[in-house]
């Protein structure tokens, strides 16, 4: 199925005053929405200060082998590596590194309101798949268009437009996202493409850049084709992605290694996001238990008051 979108009007721009029902409608129709002022400038500055050292020490995307693409198919694991970028840093472990991430990001009320609308009826509880700082240096080439749900084998079996979505991403701008410094490129409506629609990897006329000011966010479904743009500027481009999915799925990023004292400084909701609490599916059946008991009870887990 091919879906035609008016590029001049998408992604729609919303703020916290926009009715949540309208926001969800835009996400389901276009696959993405831009949120103005998702985080305030002071919070962005605190987050930047907490991650700066780790980003500076971090290495660029994983090296990949050079394949003769005309001679045969490139292994899928190498395709994944190419998506990491030779001049892009992926700084992970945010829940350990940043107090602002633990307190402000993981408890973001609007973010959770969106997740509840997307997942509640279909799946029940949800948790964090992963969270990264995405730092693009000048000279980084455009990333190929892809769907983040490709990490799930089950995504190949989604066939109908009304099949449930099982990943939603919140990409927050920590610096400006401009067309010349690698703003994320989105193909609105591509979450509705079925197997009959040939995938688009580079240079799509249907793609639009997500132009953002620091603190803005683009919220997009994992089934939407997207990719980081080319950084033709002299500035780095930095963002933070927080990926959420149903509790049914195993996250890409584990948080078992977090010291208990750090986890106990978090709210119950934030603890759930990093897998330190038992959750329920859409039928109120417990998921992620310790025997027949809740993880938090077995661990005698303390928590911070609601943030």
Curated annotation (Swiss-Prot):
Pfam families: PhyH. Its EC number is 1.14.11.-. Disulfide bonds: none annotated. Pathway: Secondary metabolite biosynthesis; terpenoid biosynthesis. It catalyses: verruculide A + 2-oxoglutarate + O2 = chrodrimanin T + succinate + CO2; chrodrimanin E + 2-oxoglutarate + O2 = chrodrimanin A + succinate + CO2. Gene3D superfamilies: q2cbj1_9rhob like domain. The keyword Iron applies. GO terms for biological process: terpenoid biosynthetic process. GO terms for molecular function: dioxygenase activity; metal ion binding. It comes from the Eukaryota. Keywords: Dioxygenase, Iron, Metal-binding, Oxidoreductase. Fe cation binds at residues 146, 148, 226. Its cofactor is Fe cation. The keyword Metal-binding applies. Compounds in the chrodrimanin family such as chrodrimanin A or verruculide A exhibit strong inhibitory activities against protein tyrosine phosphatase 1B (PTP1B) and therefore, they could potentially be developed into drugs for the treatment of type 2 diabetes or obesity. Furthermore, chrodrimanin B, the end product of the pathway involving chrodrimanin A or verruculide A, does not exhibit the PTP1B inhibitory activity, while it functions as a potent blocker of insect GABA-gated chloride channels. Dioxygenase; part of the gene cluster that mediates the biosynthesis of chrodrimanin B, a meroterpenoid that acts as a potent blocker of insect GABA-gated chloride channels. The first step of the pathway is the biosynthesis of 6-hydroxymellein by the polyketide synthase cdmE. The prenyltransferase cdmH acts as a 6-hydroxymellein 5-farnesyltransferase and produces the hydrophobic metabolite verruculide C. The FAD-dependent monooxygenase cdmI further converts verruculide C into verruculide B. Homodimer. Belongs to the PhyH family. This is Dioxygenase cdmD. It comes from Talaromyces verruculosus.
């Amino acid at each position: 199925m091919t879906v035609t979108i008016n590029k001049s009007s998408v992604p729609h721009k919303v703020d916290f005053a926009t009715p949540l029902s309208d926001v969800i409608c835009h996400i389901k129709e276009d696959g993405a929405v831009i949120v103005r002022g998702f985080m305030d400038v002071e919070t962005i500055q605190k987050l930047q200060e907490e991650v700066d050292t780790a980003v500076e020490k971090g290495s660029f995307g994983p090296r990949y082998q050079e394949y003769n693409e005309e001679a045969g198919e490139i292994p899928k694991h190498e395709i994944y590596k190419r998506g990491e970028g030779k001049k892009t840093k992926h700084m992970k472990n945010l829940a350990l590194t940043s107090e602002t991430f633990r307190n402000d990001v993981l408890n973001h009320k609007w973010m959770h309101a969106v997740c509840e609308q997307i997942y509640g009826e279909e799946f029940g509880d949800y948790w964090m798949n992963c969270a990264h700082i995405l730092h693009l240096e000048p000279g980084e080439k455009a990333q190929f268009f892809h769907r983040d749900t490709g990490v799930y084998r089950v995504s190949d079996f989604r066939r109908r437009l009304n099949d449930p979505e099982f990943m939603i991403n919140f990409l927050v701008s920590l610096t400006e996202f401009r067309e010349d410094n690698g703003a994320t490129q989105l193909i609105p409506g591509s979450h509705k493409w079925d197997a009959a629609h040939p995938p688009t990897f580079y240079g799509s006329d249907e793609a639009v850049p997500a132009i953002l000011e620091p603190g803005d966010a683009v919220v997009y479904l994992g089934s939407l084709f997207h990719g980081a743009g080319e950084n033709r500027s002299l500035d780095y481009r930095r963002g933070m992605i927080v990926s959420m999915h149903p509790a049914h799925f195993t996250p890409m990023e584990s948080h078992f290694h977090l010291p208990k004292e750090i986890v106990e400084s978090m709210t119950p909701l934030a603890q759930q996001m990093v897998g330190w609490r038992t959750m329920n599916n859409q039928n109120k059946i417990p998921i992620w238990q310790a025997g027949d008991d809740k993880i938090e009870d077995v661990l005698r887990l303390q928590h911070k008051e609601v943030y």
